[in-house]
């Protein structure tokens, strides 16, 4: 970890805990800052806060008292899930207190260069593929961080200059960066999302675009050339642009030609040898290839990963085949486009489990993708909205309380040869703390169903 002096004796408020808040508070404490942590969860139910108190860090739990900001803080590090219209954040900004997210701290202390990956969809898969490719080239040369793996600052604390940090980054995290500068930035795609958090689409796009704002001509920006919006934005960057495309023969960057994955007119390997199915995963593969080739990974090492990588947990993850049905866990489908992509990947009849946090979408965009859906099980805040679209499509719709209750209904409505797919098209936060918790609840419910039926 870089021994930076700028935080020594600085009065810092860490707002919101979870993993990233705990990491930020611990590191700030080590750097000599006077740290106060504020979290809404009551102290008695908050083991993270209890652990920080044992380190000598001041902890305030149970609410976010607005008057706390009158205590002369010089910096606020906020949990990325706390929106900028939160009263605490609004007051901090009004008082001209700098507000950052934990990834900014990670960059400041990191000795390792960062490969930062963002986008509406595909960032987890792309980050993971890049991580595997770099490690195939040189063992332990990549560390996973961000939304996947460990908090960015915790990884940065222990990373060395001969490693890379492969860091998945959300728009929430990128809104709070000032000096953050990845050596390689990746933008997989941009679609409409998180409009409950961002004021409008423009703010969302700009948050994603922040990933490259401090890059120089010595850095690289890997970007989806099939999206005109992103293509036009590249006129504003100082980084070297490396395009990728699933539809165009580019001649530079990564693309597909004559059934082969290409990079700068060089054949990397046959597309048919890639284990990951689906057009959406081709985007992820091409973005990963562009990064890997830029960092010196050989074609053989790249193809070894692509021929063996089965995908990311909770992302169209095959769970089990039982009673002739195949169960898939796509809990990470937290927006409509991700569910569209999942449905496109199946030819057999699908029993779809969907629903979750209401962000104001109508879900009409799912209608053309319901051709293969034979039954729809809905839950959460958006149950009525998604159910309405199912009824328009002429699908049998069943309303249940949660994912766990959806599994036995899905089994009852299915037949041998069918796909049972959890692909919610919504964030999990109305009922589950994370999409991982939701996905695990689904897989646990499948296990309980099998046990019950086979008694």
Curated annotation (Swiss-Prot):
GO terms for molecular function: ATP binding; tetrahydrofolylpolyglutamate synthase activity; UDP-N-acetylmuramoylalanine-D-glutamate ligase activity. Belongs to the MurCDEF family. This is UDP-N-acetylmuramoylalanine--D-glutamate ligase. One of its GO terms (biological process) is peptidoglycan biosynthetic process. Cell wall formation. Catalyzes the addition of glutamate to the nucleotide precursor UDP-N-acetylmuramoyl-L-alanine (UMA). Its EC number is 6.3.2.9. It catalyses: UDP-N-acetyl-alpha-D-muramoyl-L-alanine + D-glutamate + ATP = UDP-N-acetyl-alpha-D-muramoyl-L-alanyl-D-glutamate + ADP + phosphate + H(+). Transmembrane segments: none annotated. It is found in: Cytoplasm. The keyword Cell division applies. Pathway: Cell wall biogenesis; peptidoglycan biosynthesis. ATP binds at residues 119-125. GO terms for cellular component: cytoplasm. The keyword Cell division applies. Pfam families: Mur_ligase_C, Mur_ligase_M, MurD-like_N. It is an enzyme of class 6 (ligase). Keywords: ATP-binding, Cell cycle, Cell division, Cell shape, Cell wall biogenesis/degradation, Cytoplasm, Ligase, Nucleotide-binding, Peptidoglycan synthesis.
């Amino acid at each position: 970890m870089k021994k930076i002096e700028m935080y020594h004796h600085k009065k810092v408020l860490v707002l919101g805990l979870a993993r990233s808040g705990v990491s930020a508070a611990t590191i700030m404490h080590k750097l000599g800052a006077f740290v106060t942590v504020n979290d809404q969860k009551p102290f008695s139910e908050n083991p993270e806060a209890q652990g920080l108190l044992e380190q000598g860090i001041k902890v305030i739990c149970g609410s976010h008292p607005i008057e706390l900001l009158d205590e002369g803080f010089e910096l606020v590090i906020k949990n990325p899930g706390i929106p900028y219209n939160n009263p605490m954040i609004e007051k901090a900004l009004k008082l001209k207190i700098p507000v950052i997210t934990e990834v900014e701290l990670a960059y400041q202390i990191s000795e390792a260069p960062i490969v930062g990956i963002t986008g509406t969809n595909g960032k987890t898969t792309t980050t993971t593929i890049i991580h595997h490719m770099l490690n195939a080239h040189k063992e332990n040369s990549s560390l996973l961080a961000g939304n996947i793996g460990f908090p960015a600052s915790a990884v940065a604390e222990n990373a060395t200059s001969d490693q890379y940090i492969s860091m998945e980054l959300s728009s929430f995290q990128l809104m709070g960066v000032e000096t953050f500068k990845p050596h390689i930035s990746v933008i997989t795609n941009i679609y409409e999302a998180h409009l409950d958090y961002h004021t409008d689409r423009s703010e969302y796009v700009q948050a994603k675009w922040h990933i490259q704002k401090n890059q120089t001509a010595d850095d690289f920006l890997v970007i989806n050339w099939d999206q005109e919006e992103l293509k036009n934005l590249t006129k504003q960057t100082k980084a070297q642009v490396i395009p990728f495309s699933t539809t165009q023969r580019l001649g530079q960057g990564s693309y597909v030609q004559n059934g082969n994955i290409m990079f700068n007119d060089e054949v990397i390997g046959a597309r048919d040898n890639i284990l990951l199915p689906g057009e959406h995963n081709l985007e992820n593969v091409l973005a990963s290839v562009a990064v890997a080739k830029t960092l010196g990974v050989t074609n053989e090492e790249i193809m070894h990963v692509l021929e063996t990588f089965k995908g990311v947990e909770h992302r169209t993850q095959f769970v089990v085949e039982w009673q002739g049905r195949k169960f898939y866990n796509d809990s990470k489908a937290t927006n409509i486009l991700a569910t569209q992509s999942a449905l496109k990947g199946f030819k057999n009849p699908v029993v779809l489990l969907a629903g979750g946090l209401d962000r104001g979408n109508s879900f009409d965009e799912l209608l053309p993708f319901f051709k293969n859906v034979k039954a729809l099980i809905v839950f959460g805040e958006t149950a009525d909205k998604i159910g309405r679209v199912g009824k328009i499509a002429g699908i049998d719709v069943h309303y249940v309380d949660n994912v766990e209750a959806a599994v036995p209904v899905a089994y009852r409505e299915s037949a041998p040869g069918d796909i049972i797919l959890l692909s919610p098209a919504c964030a999990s936060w109305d009922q589950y703390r994370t999409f991982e918790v939701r996905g695990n609840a689904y897989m646990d419910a499948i296990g309980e169903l099998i046990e019950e039926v086979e008694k």
